Design a protein with these regions (language model features):
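Conserved residues in the N-terminal Rossmann fold of short-chain dehydrogenase/reductase
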Residues: 21-22, 62, 155, 209
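Strand-loop microenvironment adjacent to phosphate/nucleotide-handling motifs in alpha/beta enzyme folds
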Residues: 71, 77, 107, 111-296
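Conserved Rossmann-fold cofactor-binding substructure of NAD(P)-dependent oxidoreductases
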Residues: 8, 14-40
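Short alpha-helix adjacent to the SAM-binding motif of class I
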Residues: 2-8
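Adenine-nucleotide cofactor-binding loop residues
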Residues: 1, 26, 48
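Conserved Rossmann-fold NAD(P)-dependent oxidoreductase catalytic core, especially the SDR/UDP-sugar
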Residues: 43, 47-103, 107, 111
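Hydrophobic/aromatic anchor residues within beta-strands of the central parallel beta-sheet
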Residues: 20, 60, 83, 123-126
Length: 296
């Protein structure tokens, strides 16, 4: 369906440079065919529902881990030059299987820079927070539930990072232009409290406490205190570099401007100094999710 919808938006007679493939990252031969004469790859394919991962662990391993390795091998084999893989805050100190598979994927893409040989090829990773309005996320769920007058709250203390789809795309484009390879980039973005999201969407709704789901955290991290020893500040983004020092050498050789973060620095959705207010959340929902939104 997604390929068909894209073909309607970008018909081949008007965009002859585009090709639309059905396939699966589990199928390395199909990946090689799809990547012929391709210079740039943005790897966004993943299974991502946390509870589903706990119940179907090997399916997540096949797509998120083995699929990532298939993408890497196909890029090495076909002459791709730039690869950006999308990650998640759940990959930082993961407590659920989904986060663990994405952490493994991150490590595979970063390590791929060590096996590229003399190819003009770099692999980088970008780590997002919750993409506002994405399928299966809390805001579309609350918008649907608000029509029933009830917003189930997992834990009133819960917080999450927030990024818009447009900001996420801009980060990928920045990475393609500026990244040197081997870095994991982290955006500087605000957090929200789950109770503020509930108040923004359904101030008149009931808000029963139902408990957290399997594999969930109260707060998410994008940079752990252990990461701080190899983390640098690039201005618009943080970058976690390989712990062997090769990333620092690469940035120093390229005369890039950066500063080191304090040892023990951690980037946590609960301790983030930048929180979205209820009015700000309502404006963002109108801007990025539903232009006709009004609180219930």
């Amino acid at each position: 369906l997604k390929q068909w919808e894209l073909q309607q938006l970008f018909p081949v007679d008007r965009y002859p440079q585009l090709r639309f493939f059905l396939g699966d990252v589990r199928d390395q031969d199909r990946l090689r065919r799809a990547l012929e004469r391709v210079d740039t790859v943005v790897h966004a394919a993943a299974l991502k529902q946390v509870p589903a991962a706990e119940y179907n662990p090997m399916e997540f391993v096949k797509t998120n881990v083995l699929g990532a390795e298939n993408v890497i091998q196909a890029c090495l084999d076909t002459g791709v030059r730039r690869v950006v893989a999308l990650s998640t805050d759940k990959a930082a100190a993961p407590i659920n299987l989904y986060g663990a598979t994405k952490l493994c994927s991150d490590k595979l893409f970063i390590a791929a820079n060590n096996i590229k040989g003399k190819r003009d090829l770099s692999f980088s990773v970008v780590r997002y927070g919750n993409v506002m309005g994405s399928r299966g996320s809390v805001i579309p769920f609350f918008l649907n539930q608000a029509r029933k007058g009830v917003l189930p709250i997992t834990d009133p203390a819960m917080t999450r990072f927030n990024i818009s789809l447009q900001e996420g795309v801009a980060m990928v484009l920045w990475t393609l232009e500026h990244a040197l390879g081997s870095e994991l980039l982290v955006p500087k973005i605000p957090s929200y409290r789950i109770m503020d999201v509930a108040e923004a969407i359904g101030p008149g709704c009931e808000k029963p406490i139902v408990g957290i789901r399997p594999g969930e955290k109260i707060h998410e991290e994008m940079i752990t205190a252990s990461d701080s020893f190899s983390c640098i500040d690039l201005g618009p983004y943080y970058a976690i570099l390989p712990s062997d020092g090769s990333g620092h050498e690469r940035y120093d050789s390229a005369s890039c401007s950066y500063s080191s973060v304090d040892k023990g620095f951690a980037y946590n959705s609960g301790s983030n100094p930048d929180f979205l207010s209820v009015p700000q959340l309502r404006e963002l929902i109108k801007q990025y999710v539903d232009p006709n939104f009004a609180p219930f």
